[in-house]
A protein has these predicted regions:
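Residue-level detector of the transmembrane beta-barrel scaffold of outer-membrane proteins
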Residues: 38-40, 69-71, 96, 112-116, ...
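Short loop/turn motifs that connect adjacent beta-strands in outer-membrane beta-barrel proteins
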Residues: 27-35, 51, 67, 102-112, ...
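Hydrophobic, lipid-facing positions within transmembrane beta-strands of outer-membrane proteins
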Residues: 37-41, 54-58, 91-95, 113, ...
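Outer membrane beta-barrel transmembrane domains
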Residues: 176-257
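Solvent-exposed loop/turn segments connecting transmembrane beta-strands
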Residues: 46-54, 81-88, 135, 162-172, ...
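Outer-membrane pore/translocation modules
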Residues: 78-170, 243, 257
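Transmembrane beta-strands of outer-membrane beta-barrel pores
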Residues: 43-47, 74-80, 101, 119-123, ...
Length: 257
C-alpha cells in the first residue's frame, strides 16, 4: 500500500510539472501533455515603422512515442505596407522534428534536452509587393533545454539557421522563465507568467536583433490553454524604416492526439 501511495504521488507530481504549460515564445523540451500531439494556433500582430503585419500560424505536432515528435506548420500572412496596397496569402511551410537526447527526473521536477530540426519549404507567394514568401530554403538545427519544477520553469534554445537565395544565415538564442501565479493542483486550472528574451544574430551582415517578451498563460484543463504576450525590441540593428515597434501575440493550444 505504501509503495502504491508513493507511486501515485510521483505520477501526480510529474503530471503537474507537465501541466505547468510551455513558454509562449521559446521552444520546450517537454513532448507530452500540452506540449505533445495536438494543435497550436495564434494571431501575431507585428507593428513596424513602415508596415503592419498579421500572421496566423497553425502548427500540428504528432508524437512518435514519448521521445520523438514530428509536425508541420503553415501560416497565413497579411501585410499592410505604407503607401502600398495590402497583400495577403499563405506563407512558407515548415516541417519539424524533435528528438529527446537527455532526461533526468526527480520528485516534482525534470530536466530535459532535445534536438530540433526545422526545414522550411518556400511555397509562399513571391510575386506580390511586398512578398508573402521568403523564396528561400531554410534548415535550422537547435538544442532546447528545460528545467521544470512545480514552482517555476527555465527554458533555453540555441540554434543555427542556414538559408539560401542570398538571405543571411543566423544564430538564434532564446530564453524563458515561467512562473505559476496560482497554487499547483490537478486537474489543472492555472495562470502562468512568462518572461524571456528572443534573439537572432545575422552572421553574414553582423547584425543583431533582441526582443524582450512577456505574457500570461491560462491553462483551463489538461487538454487546453490560452495565452497572450507582447514582445518589444531592445536591440534591432536594421534600417530605421524597418524597425519593429512591438509584437502582440494571442492564441491557444489544444491536445487532440
Amino acid at each position: 500500500m505504501n509503495r502504491l501511495i508513493i507511486l501515485l504521488i510521483g505520477v501526480l507530481a510529474t503530471t503537474s510539472v507537465f501541466a505547468q504549460g510551455p513558454p509562449i515564445f521559446t521552444e520546450t523540451p517537454i513532448l507530452l501533455g500540452l506540449d505533445g500531439g495536438g494543435m497550436r494556433t495564434f494571431g501575431r500582430f507585428i507593428v513596424k515603422e513602415n508596415a503592419t503585419v498579421y500572421v496566423q500560424p497553425l502548427a500540428i505536432p504528432y508524437n512518435l512515442g514519448s521521445k520523438t515528435q514530428i509536425g508541420i506548420a503553415g501560416r497565413f500572412i497579411n501585410i499592410n505596407l505604407n503607401n502600398f496596397e495590402s497583400v495577403s496569402g499563405f506563407g512558407d511551410l515548415t516541417f519539424f522534428l524533435k528528438q529527446q537526447l537527455y532526461q533526468k527526473d526527480g520528485k516534482g521536477k525534470t530536466f530535459r534536452i532535445i534536438a530540433k530540426l526545422d526545414q522550411v519549404f518556400p511555397i509562399g507567394k513571391t510575386s506580390s509587393m511586398p512578398s508573402i514568401g521568403s523564396d528561400s530554403w531554410q534548415s535550422q538545427l537547435s538544442l532546447v533545454t528545460g528545467y521544470v519544477t512545480l514552482k517555476y520553469g527555465i527554458y533555453g534554445q540555441v540554434g543555427y539557421n542556414l538559408t539560401s537565395n542570398g538571405l543571411p544565415d543566423n544564430l538564434i538564442y532564446n530564453a524563458a522563465f515561467v512562473y505559476p501565479l496560482l497554487p499547483q493542483k490537478y486537474p489543472p486550472n492555472q495562470l502562468n507568467l512568462n518572461i524571456g528574451i528572443n534573439g537572432k544574430f545575422f552572421t553574414d551582415v553582423n547584425s543583431n536583433t533582441i526582443l524582450a517578451s512577456g505574457g500570461i498563460q491560462w491553462i483551463t484543463s489538461k487538454t487546453a490553454l490560452f495565452e497572450a504576450g507582447i514582445q518589444i525590441p531592445i536591440v534591432e540593428e536594421v534600417p530605421k524604416a524597418q524597425k519593429t515597434n512591438y509584437v502582440l501575440t494571442f492564441g491557444t493550444r489544444i491536445l487532440i492526439f
